[in-house]
């Protein structure tokens, strides 16, 4: 049984943890999890406990975690990422440190955990507070998942003294099946799959995953990928995040990556219907004031057909419960704004 080491006595996280432990020990072969809903409506699915245990062993073995190491639970337990932190603790004998899920997971922690799994937003926020940044630097094994790690965040982590990893996975793979190092001499833009995982590209150029330890089915993802001769891969974007504007295909993630260094506020690229172009590239941004030179700034870094035809200031960029940009909500919001 997990024995939580809890720095702050918040009953809601305790109740959620106990509910999951009760479900885990109820004698049934599966537990329920919820997908993030980043590309559409969140879905509920049942996953096998034995495969969650297999996933936990893959991660703990890869990272070299030891029995008795502390593991920080700082993500909601309705999603696979939070559940897998608990399962790793159960399977590997880790000491679970529980905090209320928030944008500042280290705010109430006195001592850095040995192992922590966070989303990019939590890492970014922690870097902004000196005390939290120092604790983050002391985490011996930090994995970051649930969203892309942009170049600026990767640069901020590059000189960390301990291992920092970006993970690749999804609910269907029970958290991650591949990692890439973000700091030190091993830093790379290529993900390395676990030894038991096989990957290839579909005819669409999307990543196909064969990971029998965590899913009995071969999974074809919507992630457009590139493979190298070492069996590694990198993600170029999602097939459903491609905008076809006047016959030119624009990958949303690539456009956002070029804009990120020059836009110091939250933003998202999407598309709205256009009579002439089919789809028009559209930018939503959450700045405190209007940005009259925004289009020119975009033109300075984007090819002509990638540049937004519309820019709309919004109160906030819609996100899912796990902190990802909610692409479906962003697109719907842009369509409403375009209609006036």
Briefly describe each language-model feature range.
Residues 15-34, 67-70:
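Conserved pre-ATP/AMP-binding loop-to-beta segment of ANL
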Residues 30-57, 64-66:
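Conserved AMP-binding A3 loop
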Residues 38, 119, 146, 169, ...:
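Active-site glycine-centered loops adjacent to acidic/histidine catalytic or metal-binding residues
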Residues 47-54, 70-125:
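AMP-binding/adenylate-forming
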Residues 129-184:
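Gly/Ser/Thr-rich phosphate-binding loop
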Residues 198-220, 224-226, 232, 286:
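AMP-binding/adenylate-forming core of the ANL superfamily
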Residues 224-306:
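AMP-binding/adenylate-forming catalytic core of the ANL superfamily
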Residues 282-284, 297-340:
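Conserved C-terminal "lid"/linker of ANL adenylate-forming enzymes
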């Amino acid at each position: 049984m997990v024995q939580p080491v809890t720095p702050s006595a918040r009953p809601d996280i305790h109740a959620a943890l106990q509910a999951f432990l009760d479900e885990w020990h109820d004698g049934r072969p599966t537990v329920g999890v919820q997908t993030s809903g980043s590309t559409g409506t969140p879905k509920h699915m049942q996953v096998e406990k034995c495969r969650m245990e297999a996933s936990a062993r893959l991660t703990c073995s890869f990272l070299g975690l030891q029995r008795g190491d502390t593991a920080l639970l700082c993500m909601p337990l309705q999603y696979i990422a939070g559940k897998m932190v608990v399962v790793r603790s159960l399977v590997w004998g880790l000491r679970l440190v529980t905090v209320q899920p928030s944008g500042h997971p280290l705010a109430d922690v006195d001592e850095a955990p040995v192992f922590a799994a966070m989303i990019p937003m939590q890492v970014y926020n922690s870097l902004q507070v000196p005390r939290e940044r120092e604790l983050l630097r002391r985490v011996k094994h930090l994995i970051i998942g649930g969203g892309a790690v942009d170049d600026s965040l990767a640069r901020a982590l590059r000189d960390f003294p301990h291992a920092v990893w970006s993970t690749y996975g999804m609910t269907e793979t029970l958290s991650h099946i591949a990692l890439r190092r973000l700091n030190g001499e091993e830093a790379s833009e290529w993900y390395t799959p676990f030894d038991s995982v096989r990957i290839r590209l579909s005819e669409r150029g999307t990543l196909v995953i064969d990971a029998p330890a965590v899913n009995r089915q071969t999974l074809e993802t919507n992630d457009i990928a590139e493979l190298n001769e070492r069996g590694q891969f990198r993600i170029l974007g999602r097939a459903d995040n491609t905008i076809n504007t006047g016959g030119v295909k624009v990958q949303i993630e690539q456009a956002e990556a070029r804009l990120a260094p020059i836009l110091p506020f939250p933003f998202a690229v999407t598309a709205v219907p256009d009579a002439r172009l089919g789809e028009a590239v559209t930018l939503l941004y959450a700045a405190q004031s209007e940005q009259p030179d925004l289009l020119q700034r975009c033109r300075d870094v984007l090819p002509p057909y990638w540049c937004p035809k519309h820019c709309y200031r919004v109160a906030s960029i819609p996100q899912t419960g796990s902190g990802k940009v909610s692409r479906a909500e962003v697109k719907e919001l842009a369509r409403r704004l375009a209609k006036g």
